[in-house]
Design a protein with these regions (language model features):
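Hinge/lid segment of periplasmic solute-binding proteins
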Residues: 102-151, 294-300
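Conserved N-terminal structural module of periplasmic/extracytoplasmic solute-binding proteins
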Residues: 2-4, 8-13, 17-18, 24-106, ...
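Short amphipathic alpha-helical coupling segments at ligand-binding clamshell hinges
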Residues: 54, 58, 238-245, 327-340, ...
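Extracytoplasmic/periplasmic substrate-recognition and gating elements
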Residues: 60, 64-65, 70-72, 162, ...
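Conserved C-terminal helix/tail region of periplasmic/extracytoplasmic solute-binding proteins
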Residues: 160, 184, 344-347, 359, ...
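Glycine-centered hinge/linker elements that transmit conformational signals in sensory
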Residues: 179-180, 224-257
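Extracytoplasmic/periplasmic solute-binding protein
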Residues: 141-143, 150, 176-227, 272
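Short helix-initiation/N-cap motifs at beta->coil->alpha
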Residues: 75-85, 172-174, 255-269
C-alpha cells in the first residue's frame, strides 16, 4: 500500500488566505563598523511560492560563497495578488533589489525601475525567443525564470483501468468521450469526480484556459496581444465548451474550490482523474505521494481546433533588477542572477531542486527530473506549442475575464454577455 502524507487543512487555509513567505539567508546582520559598510543586502520579492524553500536554501549557499552579500527572499502567492503586493512594496519605500514580472504588461507597469540586463552572462545564455517579451530596442529588461507548460494533467493508472489510451485524445470530441467514460466508472475508479476545476482562482480560467483559445487570434505572439486594441473571441465557442465540460464533470461547488485543494486534496490523493494545471504542481504532488508523482502522472494538451496536440509553453516570470538601487547593489544583483543560472551549483539547483525546465543554454536536459516537465520539454523541442499571449493582456484583464467566467458559472451572466463585457473592458484598458 502506498503511503500518503496526510492532507493538511492548515496548508489549505494558508493557500486560501494567500501566502507570503519570507526567508533570510545565512548571512545575517553585518554588525557595526567597516563590516557593516561593506555588506550588501539584496531583498528579493517574487511571486512563485512553489520553490520558496529550495530558493532560500540556494541563497544560503551563495551567501557562504559570498560573505559580503546578504539575501532576503519574500515569496508571495496562493490567493494573494502578487502585483498589488509588489506595488505596495514600492509605494511604502521598501523597494526590493530583485523582483519578478510576468511579460510585457508588467514590464510596462514597472518600466522606470527596470535595469538593462543585456550585459549579463544569463542574457547571453538565454534560449532564442525567451527574451522577446522583455526586450526594448537593445535593452533586456528581465531574465527568464524557466520554461513552463500546462494542460490537462491526468492519472495514468485511472486511464488505463478505464480502458482509455491518452495518445488517442486529440480533439474535443475525443476528450469528451474519455471524460464520459471516466464519469461512468467513477465508483470502480474510486473517484469523486473526473475533474477538480478550481473556479475560485480567476487565473486558472481567465489566464490559462482562455489563453489557448486566444493564442491563435494573436498568432501566438505575446507582443501582438500586448499591442492589440481589442480582442475578438474568435474561438469563444470552443472556450465555452471546454469550461462547461470541466465544470459539468467537476467536484462541486467548483466556485469555492481553490488551487491548493485541487492539487493536494483531490489530485494528489487520487480523488479525481484530471486537473487543468502545469508542471509547477509537481513538487506539491511529489511531497504528497512520491510514488504516484513519479509513475502515474501525465499531461495532455487542451484541444484547440487547428492546433490539436500542442501544449501552451512559455516563460511565466522574469527577474528584474531595481534600477533605483545604488550601483554596487545593482551589480551584486546581476552577479547573483548570473550565478543562479550559469554556475554549476546554480544549474544543479535549477534542474534538481527547483525542478525547472531551463530557459538557458548549457544545461543537460536529459537530467530534467520530473515526468511532467520531460513531456513538456518534448512538446517544445518538437515545436508542438501554443503561445502564452495572456502575458500580453491589458493590466488585470485576466482577472476581469476570470470574474466574468465565475459569473457565467453561477448563472449571473450569459456567455454572450461575458464576451461583450470582456471586450469592452479590454478596449477601455487600452485607451
Amino acid at each position: 500500500m502506498k503511503s500518503k502524507k496526510l492532507y493538511s487543512k492548515i496548508v489549505s487555509t494558508l493557500a486560501v488566505s494567500g501566502l507570503l513567505l519570507a526567508g533570510c539567508g545565512s548571512g545575517g546582520d553585518a554588525g557595526n563598523g567597516a563590516a557593516s559598510e561593506d555588506q550588501i543586502t539584496i531583498d528579493i520579492f517574487q511571486g512563485k511560492v512553489e520553490f520558496n524553500d529550495q530558493f532560500n536554501a540556494l541563497a544560503e549557499k551563495y551567501e557562504e560563497e559570498n560573505p559580503g552579500v546578504n539575501i532576503n527572499i519574500t515569496s508571495v502567492g496562493g490567493g494573494t495578488d502578487y502585483i498589488s503586493s509588489l506595488k505596495s512594496q514600492f509605494s511604502s519605500g521598501e523597494e526590493p533589489e530583485i523582483f519578478s514580472i510576468a511579460g510585457p504588461s508588467e514590464a510596462d507597469q514597472f518600466k522606470e525601475y527596470l535595469t538593462d540586463l543585456s550585459d549579463t552572462k544569463s542574457a547571453e545564455a538565454a534560449l532564442e525567443g525567451t527574451l522577446t517579451a522583455v526586450t526594448e530596442g537593445e535593452k533586456v529588461l528581465g531574465l527568464p525564470f524557466n520554461q513552463e507548460g500546462y494542460g490537462l494533467i491526468y492519472n495514468k493508472a485511472m486511464f488505463e483501468k478505464a480502458g482509455i489510451n491518452p495518445e488517442e485524445i486529440l480533439t474535443y470530441d475525443d476528450l469528451e468521450k474519455a471524460v464520459k467514460t471516466l464519469d461512468s466508472k467513477k465508483e470502480d475508479l474510486g473517484i469523486e469526480a473526473v475533474f477538480a476545476l478550481p473556479a475560485k482562482e480567476k487565473w486558472v480560467v481567465g489566464n490559462h484556459l482562455a489563453n489557448v483559445y486566444f493564442a491563435p487570434e494573436f498568432n501566438h505572439d505575446v507582443l501582438e496581444a500586448f499591442n492589440a486594441e481589442t480582442v475578438g473571441f474568435e474561438k469563444g465557442s470552443e472556450m465555452q465548451k471546454m469550461l462547461d465540460l470541466q465544470n459539468k464533470y467537476s467536484v462541486q461547488p467548483s466556485l469555492s474550490l481553490d488551487y491548493s485543494q485541487q492539487v493536494e486534496e483531490y489530485f494528489s490523493l487520487e480523488q479525481v482523474a484530471i486537473i487543468q494545471q502545469g508542471n509547477w504542481i509537481y513538487p506539491s504532488v511529489y511531497e504528497m505521494d512520491s510514488e504516484f508523482a513519479e509513475n502515474n502522472v501525465g499531461i495532455l494538451p487542451i484541444p484547440v481546433e487547428g492546433f490539436e496536440g500542442s501544449l501552451p509553453v512559455g516563460i511565466p516570470n522574469y527577474w528584474a533588477v531595481n534600477s533605483k538601487s545604488d550601483e554596487k547593489t545593482v551589480q551584486a544583483s546581476k552577479d547573483f542572477l548570473d550565478w543562479l543560472y550559469t554556475s554549476d551549483t546554480g544549474k544543479e539547483a535549477v534542474l534538481n531542486d527547483f525542478k525547472f525546465i531551463p530557459a538557458y543554454e548549457g544545461y543537460d536536459t536529459s537530467k530534467i527530473s520530473d515526468p511532467i516537465s520531460k513531456e513538456i520539454y518534448e512538446y517544445a523541442s518538437a515545436g508542438k506549442t501554443i503561445g502564452w499571449v495572456f502575458l500580453g493582456y491589458p493590466s488585470a484583464w485576466g482577472d476581469d475575464l476570470g470574474a466574468n467566467m465565475q459569473k457565467y458559472l453561477s448563472d449571473e451572466m450569459t456567455w454572450e454577455e461575458l464576451e461583450a463585457d470582456s471586450i469592452k473592458k479590454w478596449e477601455e484598458k487600452r485607451k
